[in-house]
Structure formats: C-alpha cells, structure tokens
Amino acid sequence: MFNFLRLSNTPQLTALGGVNISQQSDDIGLAFNNPALLTPRMHSQMNAVFNDFYGGIKVFHLSLGYRNEKLNTNFLWGLNYFNYGSITETDAAGNVFGKFRPTDWVMQVSASRSYLEKWNYGAAIKWISSNYGQFRSNGIATDIGVLFSDTTRLFSASFLVKNLGVQLKRYNNAEQEELPFDLQAGITKRLEKAPFSFSLTAQRLQQFDIL
C-alpha cells in the first residue's frame, strides 16, 4: 500500500533512474528523497514540479528549504500530491452512483546536520493520505539517512532507511497493511577531468530472498 511513495518527485531524480540516494546536487528535490542530502546551500530554495499525464492524472510537488544558524540545522518542508482525475463510481452490477476524484499525497518535514567534515545525517517525518471515494487511509512514516562525502576524491556514499512507519487508518476497516519499507545503499563517483559521475544504488536490502 501507499506505493506512490516509491515514485520519483523531481526531474533530476527521474533522470538518474528514479532511485538514487548518493548524488549530491543543489537540487532540493533530491533532499526530499533522502534527508541526508539536505545542505546549508539549499537555504531559501524552492522546487516546484507539475506533471500532466493521460487520463487526467496530475502530479504536483513542492519543496522548500530553510537553514537555522542558531540550531546549526537544515530544514525542508515538502509535498507530493497525486490527482487521478474524475472516475465514475459503480457497483458490481454496473449501477452508476456518481463520480469521485481519487487522490494520494504525502507531506513531510525533514532536518539534517553535518558531523565533522565529511558526514551528514538527516531524518524526515511523513504524513501519508489516500482517498479513493469511500475507501480512505492514512499513515505516518520516517526516513533516516546518512551521507559520507569526500570532495577531494569526488566520492560519496549513503545509506537510507525509507518509509519506516505504520498505517493509522485502514481502508474501510480492511486488514492492516504494510508500508513500502525500503533499505537502500548507494555510492557515486565523479570523474576528475570529465563532467560525468557514476552511481550505483541497491534497494530493498531487507529482502534476503530476491529470487
């Protein structure tokens, strides 16, 4: 359930394959995906994305960054909103009861700090909601990330605990469902004399039986 949490929220992440936690950039949209990527350079940054798909499906994303010098902490507020258009509501016999507009959204607050010169760590708290007509659900989750960055060697590595949480309200009193929990690890190496970098990201590390 809540599988929309797996989707990319920003064009740069989509261009990187949809899953990347170690690519450092000034794009605050990447920090929405991994709080350890949130840096002081993102103070006062805003990332706004709108996608219009077939069938009336629309996706909105907004991220805002803020740096508090007194707390020595970086903050991010972000929202991902999915509108699936207008759908006709019927019963099993085909009787029409009207229309409804299903939506999914997640709102989160992230914070990060640096440790020594090469480490950065961060966490995010997420409020998740789904509305499919009479079927509604919500939940709460957290992301926890750590980033190691060696600017001299142009190398970075990160580990991320993603979507660790619980469903608070079930769909129409259905059974309790699990969130799309994920353990991810990634490395990025930038070439010294060329404008390229290579990334390797492993996901779903908690699933030992992958066959």
Give the positions of each predicted feature.
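Outer-membrane beta-barrel porins/channels
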Residues: 1-17, 21, 43, 58-211
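Active-site-flanking structural segment that lines cofactor/substrate pockets
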Residues: 20-62
